[in-house]
Curated annotation (Swiss-Prot):
This is Ribosomal protein uS12 methylthiotransferase RimO. Catalyzes the methylthiolation of an aspartic acid residue of ribosomal protein uS12. Residues 366-432 form the TRAM domain. Residues 4-122 form the MTTase N-terminal domain. Its cofactor is [4Fe-4S] cluster. GO terms for molecular function: 4 iron, 4 sulfur cluster binding; aspartic acid methylthiotransferase activity; metal ion binding; protein methylthiotransferase activity. It comes from the Bacteria. It holds the Pfam family UPF0004. It comes from Parabacteroides distasonis (strain ATCC 8503 / DSM 20701 / CIP 104284 / JCM 5825 / NCTC 11152). Belongs to the methylthiotransferase family. RimO subfamily.
Length: 432
């Protein structure tokens, strides 16, 4: 066990990662060494930042806590703290079932952890972070919470109503990250498109993107987690006309069948969804659309699922993720619907949907062979440099594997010609 060392383990989404990075900065300001690697845990203090969104994520968080509890009992770590969405949602149950944890913190009161250790919370460092990502990109959280009332979703239960961060504060944070060498910014929130409605009484995302785009040194801005209902169409010309705003939009649609959209309480119709997607592709030529879909929601019939498959084949999303419905306590669906679709049926539908998407992804990637793209290099591996185009977000999208004919520097941009493609990877060579 290393004295004055803190290990922080982050589970779940990139929004959690930002919270962990801010906590790490506070520990550093108080003289601690911090590490963010689950394979090197030996600190005097270990903090687990949990996810509580759906059953699988909850199970992963609990298993991690139990594993660390065993390490604590063996004397390999000192104090064990838990924070984040799981403990925000199930605090009393966790306190009862996991006595090996020294204290639980929620999603918003984790700042108390510092003072509970007898240390000082530095308010002037509130938005400063220790980056756990490669130094050339960072996630920037522009809001917290959600005002939507989707039937299946526990996020509003955990995080409460939407709270937009002040625009000036976000701009200052980006300037500070640019000064540290960050070039690429993933703008994130549970619902990007709601940004500003609470604080400024208007949809302010287009203005925010313009202001961040104007900052010298910002090479790429990528937008994650838009909501399709009442989409701010003023964003599209910003995306089209500004070179450093990636032609990329991550917008979770969940389904296309009108009966399912109504049961899910999505406040959008099939026709409106098609209109949105067609307008995005028309107004931003070359845009890559990423979406998330759900199968197995209560009430989903075979006809609904077949309609979803036809939709995916028709739209041909460049990027797509999917998951099976999870019956989450406290949600509208939990209170009003029966979780009647067998788990094996959910899994079969999910597997089939992803096989369809794999074929589409293979076609999308194959169409890029022979084209040249501006690529940022993320890292060097044994046989390749690994990079991404503007159409690829870290962790979730395809990467381009670049031959080692020429020495390259991670964090730098290069013109790369695609010479081969697979379903989830491209292969390329740097042009001199």
């Amino acid at each position: 066990m290393r004295k004055n060392k803190v290990d922080i383990i982050t589970l779940g989404c990139s929004k959690n990662l930002v919270d962990s990075e801010q906590l790490m900065r506070q520990f550093v300001a108080n003289g601690y060494t911090v590490e963010h690697d689950p394979h090197k845990i030996n600190g005097e203090i270990v903090v687990v930042n949990t996810c509580g969104f759906i059953g699988d994520a909850q199970e992963e968080s609990i298993n991690m806590i139990l594993e660390l509890g065993e390490q604590k009992q063996k004397g390999r770590i000192g104090k064990l703290f838990v924070m984040g969405c799981l403990s925000e949602r199930f605090l009393k149950d966790l306190e009862k079932e996991l006595p090996e944890v020294d204290r639980f913190y929620g999603k918003f009161n984790w700042k108390e952890l510092i003072s509970d250790l007898g240390k000082s919370y530095h308010q002037e460092l509130a938005t400063d972070r220790v980056l756990t990502t490669p130094r050339h990109y960072a996630y920037v959280k522009i809001g917290e919470g959600c005002n939507r009332t989707c039937s299946y979703c526990s996020i509003p239960i955990i995080t409460g109503a939407y709270q937009s961060r002040p625009m000036d504060e976000i701009v200052d944070e980006v300037r500070g990250l640019v000064a540290q060498g960050v070039k690429e910014f993933q703008m994130i929130a549970q619902d990007l498109t709601f940004y500003g409605l609470d604080r400024y009484k208007r949809m302010a995302l287009p203005e925010l993107v313009e202001r961040v785009s104007d900052i010298p040194g910002v090479e790429w801005i990528r937008l994650h987690y838009g909501y399709p209902s009442h989409f701010p169409y003023d964003l599209l010309p910003v995306m089209r006309e500004r070179d450093n705003v990636c032609k990329y939009m991550d917008i979770a649609l969940q389904h296309i069948s009108d009966p399912m959209l109504k049961m899910m309480r999505r406040n959008i119709t099939k026709a409106e969804t098609y209109e949105l997607l067609e307008r995005m592709r028309r107004e931003v030529p070359g845009i890559h659309l990423r979406t998330t879909l759900m199968v197995g929601h209560p009430g989903e019939t075979e006809q609904d699922f077949e309609e979803l498959i036809r939709f995916v084949k028709d739209i041909r999303f460049e990027r797509m993720g999917a998951f099976a419905y999870s019956h989450e306590e406290g949600t509208y669906a939990y209170q009003h619907y029966k979780d009647e679709i067998p788990q094996e049926v959910k899994q079969d539908r999910l597997d089939y949907l992803m096989r369809v998407q794999e074929g589409i992804s293979a076609d999308v990637n194959a169409s890029k062979v022979g084209q040249t793209f501006r690529v940022i290099v993320d890292r060097e591996e044994e046989d390749f440099y690994v990079g991404r185009t503007q159409y690829d977000s870290p962790e979730v999208d395809p990467e381009i594997l670049i031959s080692k004919d020429t020495p390259l520097s991670p964090g730098s941009f290069y013109q790369v010609k695609v010479i081969d493609a697979q379903a989830f990877d491209l292969y390329g060579k740097v042009l001199n």
